[in-house]
Amino acid sequence: MSIEQLSDGLWVPSTDAQIEQWREKGYPYMQDNCLNKFLEWCKEHEQKFDLVVDVGTWCGTWTLSMQQYAKNIHCYEPNNLHYGCLARNVGSYENIETYNQALGNDDGFVKLTDESATQNTRVLIEKGQTKISKLDSLGYNNIDLIKIDVEGFEMEVLKGAEKTLENVQYIMIELNGNSERYGSSKRDIKEHLKSLGFKVLIKTWPDIV
């Protein structure tokens, strides 16, 4: 498996199913309507976040678009190929830190599937070599915004972050139906967020802020 640099400078997996489209059009994050609306909201409200945590960073496209509105961003990406792209894409930014691991509702090690032709990486609940941690175990107490894009593993991330979420102001989460792999529906996740006191600010499928 290999990675390549697009004409606009972004490093991406050369095996990705959408690579031809990105070669022609550039940054893939521009396809994200919810993100674009949130960026407009941040600009309009002159919003600046002290600390943002990006869970499931992929190659860093979301982080690159948000870094202008954040003093610090911590990125978590367990897939080694995607992490290699991430490290190259954000390496010049002093306010961005990267971690090659997964987040969930357990502390230990898990196995990942290898879906190199997509942006998807599945976490298998069995022993492996990829580190996984609860967000609550990492000592955060001042996160302003969390973005979660973990291909169905959202509820596990949320359950492992119950204490941390008490002080979080905003969550952007992708709900594309893959959560049923792990026993949770989109409705379950929405109800869980509602029970924690969160209200919808922006909703453009498949993402919610």
Name each model-derived stretch.
Residues 1-94, 185-209:
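S-adenosyl-L-methionine
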Residues 4-36, 94, 99-140:
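Glycine-rich adenosyl-binding loop in Rossmann-like folds that engage adenosine-containing cofactors
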Residues 41, 45, 108-111, 158:
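Adenylate-forming
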Residues 49-62, 127-128, 132-184:
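Active-site segment flanking the S-adenosylmethionine/decSAM binding pocket
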Residues 66, 86, 112, 157-161:
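Hydrophobic packing residues within well-ordered alpha-helices of enzyme cores
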Residues 79-80, 102-105, 152, 177-179:
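Short "lid" loop at the C-terminus of a central beta-strand within the Rossmann-like core
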Residues 91, 115-117, 162, 166:
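A generic structural signal for secondary-structure junctions
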